[in-house]
Amino acid sequence: MSSKGQQLAIDYKQTEWKTPDVYNQLRGLMKDEVEIYAFCLEFLMNIEKDSTLFHSALSYVNEKDFSQLVKIAIDILKEKESAVAESVIEYAGIQLPHILHPYLDDLLVLNPNGDSYFADYHWRNCTSAQLQPYLAQFLASSTDLETKIKLFNCLVESRDITTIESLIPHALELELSTYVSSAHYIDGYLEGVGLCREYGKVKRYCSDQTYHILFEPKYLNKPSAVHLNRTDHPTWNGVPLTNKYKVGGYLAEDENNPFMHIITLNPIPEGLPIRLSQLVLGCHLRELNENGVVFYQHDEQGNPHKIGEPIVIEWVEEHAMVPTEVSIVPTDSRWAFQSWASANSRENLFRIGGEPSWVQSGEVLTCPISGEKMQFIMQLDSEVPDVQGGEVYYGSGGLCYIFWCDKTKVSGYIMQHT
């Protein structure tokens, strides 16, 4: 007799999304580690067509069982192509990259997920010792250019600064891209993984400490879309810190270009590179969506003052978020890195600290006063309710990224969307 999880996968194989109440059936398994693993195992072993239902389920598989799925997926890929097995590698690389580290050689040969943006995610957090053989292969004169480019991408994805600084002088001598210079290629790749070059050194532009912002469930949820329920995923849950933070509303109303309040950080969450006792973050969202970037300098009380005169925006009419209070929760290590596309609207991408979840490529702001690279401090997702009954969108529904220069007390905003 099949278990509930196994049976759901069997049913899905027959009728796919016509399976009665399929997502609610999956929701019923999410807190049962045995059943969610049974579902994923049956899906991996016996279903050829990949599915977001399977992707959703992987977030609830414990590390031990995920390691077993990885082993099976690699064995499958050694025998045949499998989009489902490739998804196991993709999501393990995002959530638990260390469980893939014993298979680095196999994965280089198999190259699951091909040239996709997430193909090398599993190299994240490899140690210098683990990387040494691959660095040596990259440096070897006998290694062909195509292999060197692949190894460069993998080694940078590790985020190991010692290895990367050994890599860069040699990478600069290669034709890494036919579209941009090698220097631009290197800088672009670094900024996509939380790093940047400044004054000849590689450094992180984001903090290690990460928090997720938690709203009251009814503030964000759309009851008609069960698969987008913003209470299920682990990133929408957790034990919050005691402090509450005010978000939304206006700092200054202007019919042409209102100054919208984002959040007041009081106190400043631990681990952020901010020496003020409080920081009021706000932006002219219409101008941000029209021009792509805005900057503010803050006074000693943390209040923002726009750098440059506000401009009249005629064609964009965004409104402020509905005022509310939010909590923050320290992020579990499994969710320290999140991919915007792979999250697929299931995960909480309202984050403070940590690495950005870039919609496009990395784009670290330079402070307009100090001329130095700024530190990433926060990101906001779209589809927050606004005061006019609509929703706040960054572009067509992307993310807003907030940067900070502590030397000059300047905040900067950019947004990316598809």
Residue ranges of predicted features:
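Preference for intrinsically disordered or flexible, low-complexity segments
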Residues: M1-T418
